[in-house]
A protein has these predicted regions:
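Long, low-complexity, charged/polar intrinsically disordered regions in eukaryotic proteins
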Residues: 1-20
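Short helix-coil-helix linker/hinge
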Residues: 21-25
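Basic side chains
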Residues: 11, 26, 68-71
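Winged helix-turn-helix DNA-binding recognition segment
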Residues: 18, 35-92
Length: 92
């Protein structure tokens, strides 16, 4: 887990449409804190700045949410354009 560095979080997040949805807000902030800050490789896959490799189960474990809660929160974030999902031939 990353322990160094910081992110800037603007107060306007208080007006963000998902701010009142605790699971979605928690997952979003967790993703902001855990994405790559520089390009890296993971098992032969290029993982760029702002990206990360994770399963639903891994995100659930890291956030304390259930897999179903993570899935729902990710759907919210994908639907409104905050996150995208890229599948590879090896990983869905």
């Amino acid at each position: 887990m990353l322990e160094g560095g910081f992110i800037l979080l603007h107060r306007s997040i208080l007006r963000w449409e998902w701010y009142g949805d605790l699971n979605t807000a928690r997952l979003f902030i967790h993703l902001l804190l855990t994405v790559n800050y520089e390009p890296q490789r993971w098992q032969g896959i290029a993982v760029e700045r702002g990206q990360r490799v994770a399963s639903l189960a891994k995100l659930a474990d890291e956030t304390g949410l259930t897999v179903k809660q993570v899935r729902t929160a990710l759907e919210h974030l994908k639907r409104t354009g905050e996150v995208t999902h890229t599948a590879t031939s090896k990983y869905g």
